Amino acid sequence: MIEADRLVSAEVLQDDEAIDRAIRPKLLSEYVGQPQVCEQMEIFIQAARQRGDALDHLLIFGPPGLGKTTLANIVANEMGVNLRTTSGPVLEKAGDLAAMLTNLEPHDVLFIDEIHRLSPVVEEILYPAMEDYQLDIMIGEGPAARSIKIDLPPFTLIGATTRAGSLTSPLRDRFGIVQRLEFYNVDDLQSIVSRSARFMGVEITDDGARQVAMRSRGTPRITNRLLRRVRDFAQVKGNGAIDGNIATRALDMLSVDAAGFDYLDRKLLIAIIDKFMGGPVGVDNLAAAIGEERETIEDVLEPFLIQQGFIQRTSRGRIATEHAYRHFGMVRNQE
């Protein structure tokens, strides 16, 4: 089982990007959720524009699917500058990054997704570029090699990562602004559902929007993906409009329950409760019991279940919490 097979995956799936780009907010005033981040960014952007400066370099981190790329686009729009986009794995050689930097216009935004995956040699190029707006390039090889400096226009680097702890200290310290994106509450997700439905030309009631929001695992990317599938259901099984009943039937058919769990989440929890008496159970035994890889459990399934309080990870193994028992209408055996 891979993350790309799951409807409730927070990672980008094949049909997400083009549709998400069409409904993506363009300005801070259109951005739903993350109120503290929006308030701070509005001040920082306004101050930079008043001074005629480039915005300070910005690091955005948090779980996947929460809007890091969207926020980078908004920053460029609010600053009235161009956005150049790339990602850590794409920048294999120092020359790849140098080519992008030398093509920037004053105050442009360079957005590097998955910045924690930059190679050390590329990262070294970034240090003087971020700090002094200079590019240090080695010309030639061996004893004849020499370093030349190229001046760069003032620019803003926006780095996005799901693993802020994987960034080296020298790189992390060069970001003047650091923003963490949190999981969204149901009210904000409901607003996102309603907004996306308008862009898609779909009629949806408040109850229908809330049903989709409740099962979206706090993640707008999942919200929009579920909405597209519910729209299909409403089109074929109803009159095209989405109300609470249609949304519930559609999501039940898709095996996404009221907590946002899919069959794999439920399979894991039921295995701990039924096969291992609620735990503790080691991850290797658990992987064998449900027929999945250890990495799938640790990297794909566990983070959300732990964050929601359904699994506790201890030194002796995984334990199903009372929350998990209540979700399935079960009572823990006290013996």
Swiss-Prot record:
GO molecular function per UniProt: ATP binding; ATP hydrolysis activity; four-way junction DNA binding; four-way junction helicase activity
Recorded domain comment: Has 3 domains, the large (RuvB-L) and small ATPase (RuvB-S) domains and the C-terminal head (RuvB-H) domain. The head domain binds DNA, while the ATPase domains jointly bind ATP, ADP or are empty depending on the state of the subunit in the translocation cycle. During a single DNA translocation step the structure of each domain remains the same, but their relative positions change.
EC class: hydrolase
InterPro entries per the UniProt record, alphabetical: AAA+_ATPase (IPR003593), AAA_lid_4 (IPR041445), DNA_helicase_Holl-junc_RuvB (IPR004605), P-loop_NTPase (IPR027417), RuvB-like_N (IPR008824), RuvB_C (IPR008823), WH-like_DNA-bd_sf (IPR036388), WH_DNA-bd_sf (IPR036390)
Family stated for the protein in its record: Belongs to the RuvB family.
Name of the protein described by the UniProt record: Holliday junction branch migration complex subunit RuvB
Region of interest (Small ATPAse domain (RuvB-S)), ranges: 185-255
Sequence positions that bind Mg(2+): T69
EC nos: 3.6.4.-
Pfam families: AAA_lid_4, RuvB_C, RuvB_N
Binding positions for ATP per the UniProt entry: I23, R24, G65, K68, T69, T70, E131, D132, Y133, R174, Y184, R221
Region: Head domain (RuvB-H), residue numbers: 258-335
GO cellular component: cytoplasm; Holliday junction resolvase complex
Residues where DNA binds: R294, R313, R318
Organism per entry: Photorhabdus laumondii subsp. laumondii (strain DSM 15139 / CIP 105565 / TT01) (Photorhabdus luminescens subsp. laumondii)
Subcellular compartments: Cytoplasm
Reactions catalysed, as given in the entry: ATP + H2O = ADP + phosphate + H(+)
Keyword Cytoplasm applies: yes
SMART domains for the chain: AAA (SM00382)
GO biological process, one term: DNA recombination
Region (Large ATPase domain (RuvB-L)): 4-184
Record keywords: ATP-binding, Cytoplasm, DNA damage, DNA recombination, DNA repair, DNA-binding, Hydrolase, Nucleotide-binding
Self-association and partners: Homohexamer. Forms an RuvA(8)-RuvB(12)-Holliday junction (HJ) complex. HJ DNA is sandwiched between 2 RuvA tetramers; dsDNA enters through RuvA and exits via RuvB. An RuvB hexamer assembles on each DNA strand where it exits the tetramer. Each RuvB hexamer is contacted by two RuvA subunits (via domain III) on 2 adjacent RuvB subunits; this complex drives branch migration. In the full resolvosome a probable DNA-RuvA(4)-RuvB(12)-RuvC(2) complex forms which resolves the HJ.
CDD domains: AAA (cd00009)
Role played: The RuvA-RuvB-RuvC complex processes Holliday junction (HJ) DNA during genetic recombination and DNA repair, while the RuvA-RuvB complex plays an important role in the rescue of blocked DNA replication forks via replication fork reversal (RFR). RuvA specifically binds to HJ cruciform DNA, conferring on it an open structure. The RuvB hexamer acts as an ATP-dependent pump, pulling dsDNA into and through the RuvAB complex. RuvB forms 2 homohexamers on either side of HJ DNA bound by 1 or 2 RuvA tetramers; 4 subunits per hexamer contact DNA at a time.
Gene: ruvB
